[in-house]
Amino acid sequence: MFFNSDNNPIAESVYVFMSIIFPQLKETDIEVIHTDLTEDNVFGWTLINNDQNEIEIHNDLSERDYVTTLIHELVHVKQNVHGVTDDTIREGEAYELENTLADIYLTGNSYRMLKQR
């Protein structure tokens, strides 16, 4: 189940996009919480709370940064499902994929249709 605290349509759309690439995202509960992370000096992070993955994402990002950050954090959720715990591997994969997948998402049909609403 995917829950996004602000009912942000971009978050929903990014989740659908990422679930096509990584179907295992559908196997876990994911909650996206939009919050002020200024003092933490990060755009986002992922926490495991019981069996749920909680993504906290900064509430004042540009659209590009929001999409890139959410994709980065959803890669971490996929890694959690697979039991990947090595931080070097986790961050390496997330950083390697975030911009490429953000570019694909931002130039894709689902994003364009979302923007036409």
Regions found by a protein language model. Give the residues of each.
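Post-HExxH zinc-binding segment in Zn-dependent metallohydrolases
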Residues: V84-R117
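Short pre-active-site segment immediately N-terminal to the catalytic Zn-binding motif
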Residues: D51-L70, V84-D86
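Acidic/histidine-rich, surface-exposed loop or edge segments in extracytoplasmic proteins
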Residues: M1
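Membrane-anchoring alpha-helices and their flanking helix-loop junctions
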Residues: V32, D36-E39, N80, N99, ...
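Catalytic glutamate of the conserved HExxH
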Residues: T69, E73-V77, V81
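Catalytic zinc-binding patch centered on the HExxH motif and its immediate surroundings
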Residues: E31-E54, R64
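Zn2+-dependent metallopeptidase catalytic core
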Residues: N4-T28
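Hydrophobic (often cysteine-bearing) scaffold residues that line and stabilize catalytic clefts
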Residues: I10, V67, R90
